[in-house]
From Swiss-Prot:
<dbReference type="GO" id="GO:0008803">
    <property type="term" value="F:bis(5'-nucleosyl)-tetraphosphatase (symmetrical) activity"/>
</dbReference>
<dbReference type="Pfam" id="PF00149">
    <property type="entry name" value="Metallophos"/>
</dbReference>
<keyword id="KW-0378">Hydrolase</keyword>
<comment type="similarity">
    <text>Belongs to the Ap4A hydrolase family.</text>
</comment>
<dbReference type="InterPro" id="IPR004617">
    <property type="entry name" value="ApaH"/>
</dbReference>
<dbReference type="InterPro" id="IPR029052">
    <property type="entry name" value="Metallo-depent_PP-like"/>
</dbReference>
<comment type="function">
    <text>Hydrolyzes diadenosine 5',5'''-P1,P4-tetraphosphate to yield ADP.</text>
</comment>
<dbReference type="InterPro" id="IPR004843">
    <property type="entry name" value="Calcineurin-like_PHP_ApaH"/>
</dbReference>
<protein>
    <recommendedName>
        <fullName>Bis(5'-nucleosyl)-tetraphosphatase, symmetrical</fullName>
        <ecNumber>3.6.1.41</ecNumber>
    </recommendedName>
</protein>
């Protein structure tokens, strides 16, 4: 029985299956944690969703910003961009079923036994574990409700970017969504910067990666995140694990086996990397909310 954690898949099903074959993944015994962004940019978003859903309780996943964007496109709130390559998913006969399954997935995973926390972008330094759980539950509740299109319509935007327990309504939900699925850099007081997409060494002062600021999360817990492909999993402090290594840009799909902290990688299959790079994209660029 092993715990496997995998970074952003982005529709790269063949690489996912090849990576799981390396470790002889057994859904009857093993648990698979996924950092979100299952869809977009890669060639097989539809089949990735079908496969992950078929694994049932063997999977513990979180939603990423591209997954939320897919929900908004399907709801008619956002435009379907050809570069995302999700049209086969939108047109699939089981699209309704898959979308309704997807919107009921969490935005935060916490395992108190393994002392593991997973969110697509990470945990804002302004939150402790209990605040993160509370805010995640609020987002999950509205996503799984009949009023979810109202939330999806309101989630796009960079403000508010400073946490306060006094935040309410859609503003509170937007902050929580940005913190859990879009965050990279923060100001020294923990306030989110939603503009800079650079690597840490090229970020303007006084911005710092969220994981380099003092945090309120219990240090006994490790934090798993994806989202930030240009990090290539490097430069993070002890107890923080960045697993997005840019498979859909020609990089790797990365798996971490938790029990022995061993990494496994699967290089992107060349043809798909060329398609994305020829379309003018660069590693680490994300859907803009």
């Amino acid at each position: 029985m092993s715990t496997y954690l995998i970074g952003d898949i982005h529709g790269c099903l063949d690489e996912l299956l090849a990576l799981l074959a390396q470790v002889n993944f057994d859904p009857q015994q093993d648990t698979l944690w996924l950092t979100g962004d299952l869809v977009a940019r890669g060639p097989a978003s539809l089949d990735v969703l079908r496969y992950v859903r078929s694994l049932g309780p063997a999977v513990r996943m979180v939603l990423g910003n591209h997954d939320l964007h897919l929900l908004a496109v399907y709801a008619g709130i956002s435009r379907n961009k050809p570069k995302d390559r999700i049209t086969p998913l939108l047109d699939a006969p089981d699209a309704d079923e898959l979308i309704n399954w997807l919107r009921r997935q969490p935005v935060l995973q916490v395992d108190d036994q393994l002392k593991l926390i997973m969110a697509h972008a990470g945990i804002t330094p302004q939150w402790d574990i209990e605040t993160a759980k509370m805010c995640a539950r609020e987002v999950e509740a509205v996503l799984s409700s009949d009023s979810y299109p109202l939330f999806l319509d309101a989630m796009y935007g960079d403000m508010p970017n400073n946490w306060s327990p006094e935040l309410t309504g859609l503003a509170r939900l937007r902050f929580s969504t940005n913190a859990l699925t879009r965050m990279r850099f923060c100001f020294p007081n923990g306030q989110l910067d939603m503009i800079c997409k650079d690597t840490p060494e090229n970020a303007p002062a006084p911005l710092k990666p969220w994981f380099d600021l003092p945090r309120l999360v219990d240090p006994e817990y490790s934090i798993i995140f994806g989202h930030w492909a240009s990090l290539e999993g490097k430069g993070v402090p002890e107890g923080i694990y960045g697993l997005d290594t840019g498979c859909c840009w020609g990089g790797d799909l990365t798996l971490l086996r938790w029990e022995d902290k061993r990494y496994f990688t699967q290089r992107a299959f060349k043809a798909e990397a060329e398609i994305n790079n020829n379309n003018g994209f660069a590693a680490g660029k994300e859907v803009q909310h």
